[in-house]
Swiss-Prot record:
This is Fe-S cluster assembly protein DRE2. The lineage of its organism: Eukaryota, Fungi, Dikarya, Ascomycota, Pezizomycotina. [2Fe-2S] cluster binds at residues 223, 234, 237, 239. It is found in: Cytoplasm; Mitochondrion intermembrane space. Residues 1-131 are annotated as: N-terminal SAM-like domain. Residues 132-213 are annotated as: Linker. It comes from Coccidioides immitis (strain RS). HAMAP family: Anamorsin (MF_03115).
Amino acid sequence: MERMLLLSPPSLAARPERLNTILSSHSRYATDLQMLDRVAAGLVSLPQSTYDIVMLLTDVDGLGTGSTSAMGRGVIQSVVRALRPGGKFKRENGTFTSTECPDNTELMLAGLVFDDTGGLLKPDFGPENIVPLKLGKRKPVHSVSSNGTGTSGPHVNMQLSTGSMLKGQTTTIKGVGFVDFTDDPSLSEADIYSGQTDDELIDEETLLDGEDMGRPIIQPPECRPKAGKRRRACKDCTCGLAERLREEDKAARAKADATLETMKLAPKELAEVDFTVQGKLGSCGNCALGDAFRCDGCPYIGLPPFKPGEEVRLLSNDVQL
């Protein structure tokens, strides 16, 4: 028994007597009813490959404009999936023609085709057949290269087997010839592709000599640092600028350390001068002015002022100038 699905437009829900009349003309055991607006809204999902016939009911007015406007792309795809292979999609009031249904393009893009009666049919392509592809052995074949000389190369045998249709038939596709670009004809193909040849390998370290490495690097003007600013090296510097800056910093630090070493005095080089000891000289230059201008440790404390350069004798009878 054929399974049938009736798609009802929303306007028929207000006319239950007409809907019952339509349902009475079909077997209730093999007929399902779904509202078109619920299918369009995604509230109802149609089972796949279940129905032999899907019929689109017309509106209350019999024009079918409401049902046609509700047939969107999603509804059409759901209907096609619900049809069995070879199933039909029909309309209650007629056929799908270009004047009555503006969605014929969507119907055909969904996979439906028109039959002789004007209805839409889901094609039955039958079970899927697996076509094995077998590669035959390589055999040398002679071909002509672009310079007119004959070369040999492999060809591929491809056998297509599709059961009774192509049983016993073998199709051979010849490949193009391969041109040998090697200078040594004694080398085999395996040696050529494996790289095991007698060609000398060039050491990359010998490409540049000392003279090349000693040449000055010409720096573009846009890369030169501005006047008064020191150029900074990149974080991942590879041009040698970072090493050169480190050497300059190291040399400047060593020079500063050497300057500090010359200014340091050893403990043996330090001596404390006690001006209270007789025979010592004052260094302030105010000794001749009197006690008011003399230092605390001046050896002339207590003596009257004297003229600069005048000979002065202390208690020890030492001459002080």
